């Protein structure tokens, strides 16, 4: 018993000292480790007579419990002091003025996509999406693009494997193919999204944005296409009148095909869309080729339709006076702050597309 009391008194004094966490853990090991002082005392129990063993075990357990409690209290106290010390060092001065609130801006491309979607939704179009990585069939073959067409060349298209089965889509027309394969006519959709071509200069980037439109139904003709595009261009540029001309062109997936120019004039160094004696190309369009309809199991004798493709980046440049396409992708906050839009002000036809 004298050994137990001696151990107890010695370590009670030690635990009253100003210790750090490592020192307390070391004391804990000295007492209760495999070869610790208290652990060694328990090993002596087998050598004692029964009565003596009972009393010794009782006294030993009391000392063990007391020392364990003191060690736990000591550790808690040290940890609290360390936390308080850390908090004191990291405390925040709530009297300091707050940092200025910086509100982000909507990128012009995102704004124009929202504007286009809003305009076409007013005349019954729905918005469809598809993957950026496409297969060769949806991107070329189903769209009546022959094997020897220049668009299939490596210098125009980003292929992802040697077989040329997978590629980065060169337009969003594959979304039209996917939609028609998965559903039945009539179809009235637009498909905005990223597209990819191997080109880079002031007016071209390897990745750019397009919106493709498709309307398939019975008795659809070129007049419907002209009316749809006339409505869209007037709404998008927010003008009452628009001067348009359709020039004959060629696209594998439409017949007849046309490129659309709009009239404009220069006033005070700015392009004014609507009237004027100058012309500006804005999009390509045409009546959907019968072969395309056959490829998606739609009877071309029963259903007809039109399609169009518009460069979103180009429209944004024209409408908002942006001269260099590459600036769209430079991640310059100053540029975005100047050309960006209020994220709360969602474009609608009723309140105005851009304010």
UniProtKB/Swiss-Prot annotation:
Q: Which Pfam families match?
A: Phe_tRNA-synt_N, tRNA-synt_2d
Q: Which UniProt keywords apply?
A: Aminoacyl-tRNA synthetase, ATP-binding, Cytoplasm, Ligase, Magnesium, Metal-binding, Nucleotide-binding, Protein biosynthesis
Q: Name one GO cellular component term.
A: cytoplasm
Q: What is its EC number?
A: 6.1.1.20
Q: Which residues bind Mg(2+)?
A: 255
The cross-references to InterPro entries, in alphabetical order and at most eight, read: aa-tRNA-synth_II (IPR006195), aa-tRNA-synth_II/BPL/LPL (IPR045864), Phe-tRNA-synth_IIc_asu (IPR004529), Phe-tRNA_ligase_II_N (IPR004188), Phe_tRNA_ligase_alpha1_bac (IPR022911), Phenylalanyl-tRNA_Synthase (IPR002319), tRNA-bd_arm (IPR010978)
User: Keyword Acetylation on this protein?
Assistant: no
Catalytic reaction(s) noted: tRNA(Phe) + L-phenylalanine + ATP = L-phenylalanyl-tRNA(Phe) + AMP + diphosphate + H(+)
Q: One MF term from GO for this chain?
A: phenylalanine-tRNA ligase activity
Query: Which PROSITE patterns does the UniProt record give?
Result: AA_TRNA_LIGASE_II
Q: Which CDD domains match?
A: PheRS_alpha_core
Note the HAMAP family from the entry: Phe_tRNA_synth_alpha1
Q: What is the protein named?
A: Phenylalanine--tRNA ligase alpha subunit
